């Protein structure tokens, strides 16, 4: 068979961009997007709008290898741009709307963004960010007159070169979207925590996102024409690839700007929502809401990832009609690559035991290749006893190409044919993975990554602070919150209060990253070599 080689007919680069074209053909008259009281699109209309925007981008000089950024809530336009930008040949960069202007400017500079789409609600943030740049991107305003009348007025429209609606008007709906030259060509760059001092831009290719999208649909057993509620921010790792996945199965995207429990319950009931995805905090909010007095009319599949939801929250959510699935993924893997695959015989167990099993992250998804937990010193697999802790390592098609402009960071993550996550875990006797800690010192608060190292760097800029260490403190609502342990410099005429330290951090960095708790110690505990013992501080934080 040596004479059989790849040809032009069987080696077309894998890309998910064709999902939209197919959806327009198969599900053309079906609803693609619902938003607010008046916005409804079909898949035929969504395809038309995306092609027009892609065409308009091309006409103003955006093309291959250019980075196009988006700063937006979960609106129809935000959904469309997940297709439109790569259809123009450009690389998509979604930006966290919770960041401050300084950090946004750092990201735009680092990825050399050529154009920035801005949701009107974040126009002031964007304008402030570009004033810090020597070569600012072109600004495109996503305006919504109906919502603007509600109070979010755009004060500096002159800074914006185009309106999103104008791009649709001027674009060509017959535009031939640009297929990647190689399936290894970049399609997205997403930033993890740690963006201020050393931005970590995670670059994914068409091939990896294609595989992850189909794997996510398969693992969660998403049927055709689901109704998907967007409680997960699309800026968060491209919504774990579900913008493209929902197009593949012809589903309905129920877009929502803000997470508000009563409105979420109304959307579930009004639109017959079947699937939703979010951080454990979303489950907590929905479980604690007064709207939860009445069980759901029909079951809703809820996928969560990151820190384990508390057992009490799991039990409460499932009693309301949510079918909760739990998994594990990273920005570097583009989505969930470990899920708690449910075994039928577990249904016979008491509810508390089922909740305990669901709190584990699980086993590799069907489309992912290999997962292991290894001893950091020897590199050998740890015992599968549920107790021996090691570092989680991965091999699979959806793992990133690498970190943008960071060869050392990329090299340190890829070793001996594996991707080293920096997360610590155990393997149970049945082969299921459970995360125990995060050696990268990342705190997951409300579904967002907070780098303890970055918070510590800000604390050390306070003239009263002598030593600082930040750890995760368990929180029933947020999952985890940053907890700072601080020792003050001797001889201070006035010692700052914990509230003053917190306010200082909020002024210096995005508010969600600031410590929620500050504890003053005479001296932070250290090893014989002078290293702060964070494990001890974590135990103290747990008992606070």
From Swiss-Prot:
Summary of the tissues where the protein is detected: Expressed at low levels in roots, leaves, stems, flowers and developing seeds.
InterPro entries (alphabetical): AMP-bd_C (IPR025110), AMP-bd_C_sf (IPR045851), AMP-binding_CS (IPR020845), AMP-dep_synth/lig_dom (IPR000873), ANL_N_sf (IPR042099)
EC number: 6.2.1.-
Keyword check for Lipid metabolism: yes
Keyword Lipid metabolism: yes
Pfam family, one: AMP-binding
GO molecular function: ligase activity
Broadest EC class assigned to this enzyme: ligase
Domain of life: Eukaryota
GO process terms (BP): fatty acid metabolic process
The entry's keywords: Fatty acid metabolism, Ligase, Lipid metabolism
Function: May act as an acid--thiol ligase that activates carboxylic acids by forming acyl-CoAs.
Name recorded for this polypeptide: Probable acyl-activating enzyme 8
Source organism of this protein record: Arabidopsis thaliana
Gene name of the encoded protein: AAE8
């Amino acid at each position: 068979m040596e004479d059989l080689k790849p040809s032009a007919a069987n080696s077309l680069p894998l890309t998910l961009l064709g999902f939209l074209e197919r959806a327009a053909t198969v599900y053309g008259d079906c609803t693609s997007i619902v938003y607010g009281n008046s916005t409804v699109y079909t898949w035929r209309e969504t395809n038309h709008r995306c092609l027009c925007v892609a065409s308009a981008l091309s006409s103003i000089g955006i093309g291959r290898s250019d980075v196009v950024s988006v700063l937006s809530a979960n609106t129809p336009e935000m959904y469309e741009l997940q297709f439109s930008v790569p259809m123009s040949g450009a690389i998509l960069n979604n930006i966290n709307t919770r960041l401050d202007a300084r950090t946004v400017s750092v990201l735009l500079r680092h990825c050399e963004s050529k154009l920035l789409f801005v949701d009107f609600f974040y126009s002031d943030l964007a304008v402030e960010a570009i004033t810090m740049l020597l070569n600012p991107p072109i600004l495109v305003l996503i305006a919504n007159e109906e919502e603007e009348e509600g109070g979010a007025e755009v004060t500096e429209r002159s800074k914006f070169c185009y309106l999103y609606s104008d791009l649709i008007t001027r674009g060509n709906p017959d535009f031939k979207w640009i297929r990647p030259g190689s399936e290894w060509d970049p399609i997205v760059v997403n930033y993890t925590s740690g963006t201020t001092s050393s931005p970590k831009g995670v670059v994914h290719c068409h091939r990896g996102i294609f595989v992850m999208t189909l794997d996510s649909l398969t693992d969660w057993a998403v049927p055709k024409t689901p109704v998907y509620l967007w409680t997960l921010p699309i800026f968060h790792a491209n919504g774990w690839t579900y913008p493209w996945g929902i197009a593949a199965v012809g589903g309905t995207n129920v877009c929502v700007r803000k997470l508000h429990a009563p409105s979420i319950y109304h959307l579930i009931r009004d639109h017959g929502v079947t699937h939703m995805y979010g951080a454990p905090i979303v489950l907590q909010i929905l479980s604690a809401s007064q709207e939860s007095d009445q069980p759901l009319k029909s079951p809703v599949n809820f996928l969560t990832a990151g820190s384990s939801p508390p057992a009490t929250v799991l039990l409460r959510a499932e009693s309301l009609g949510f079918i909760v699935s739990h998994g594990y993924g990273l920005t570097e893997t583009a989505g969930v690559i470990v899920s708690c695959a449910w075994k039928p015989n577990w249904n016979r167990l008491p509810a508390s035991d089922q909740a305990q099993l669901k709190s584990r992250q699980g086993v590799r998804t069907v489309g992912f290749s290999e997962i292991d937990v290894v001893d950091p010193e020897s590199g050998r697999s740890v015992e599968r006893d549920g107790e021996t802790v090691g570092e989680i390592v991965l091999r699979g098609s959806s793992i990133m190409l690498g970190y943008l402009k960071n060869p050392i960071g990329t090299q340190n993550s890829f070793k001996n044919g594996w991707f080293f996550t920096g997360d610590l875990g155990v393997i149970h006797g049945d082969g299921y993975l459970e995360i125990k800690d995060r050696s990268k010192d990342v705190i997951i608060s409300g579904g967002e990554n907070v780098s303890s190292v970055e918070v510590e760097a800000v604390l050390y800029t306070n003239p009263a602070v002598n030593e600082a260490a930040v750890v995760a403190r368990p929180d029933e609502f947020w999952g985890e919150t940053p907890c700072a342990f601080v020792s003050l410099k001797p001889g201070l005429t006035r010692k700052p209060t914990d509230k003053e330290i917190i306010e200082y951090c909020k002024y210096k960095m995005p508010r969600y990253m600031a410590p929620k708790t500050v504890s003053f110690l005479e001296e932070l505990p250290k090893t014989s070599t002078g290293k702060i013992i964070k494990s001890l501080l974590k135990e103290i934080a747990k008992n606070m």
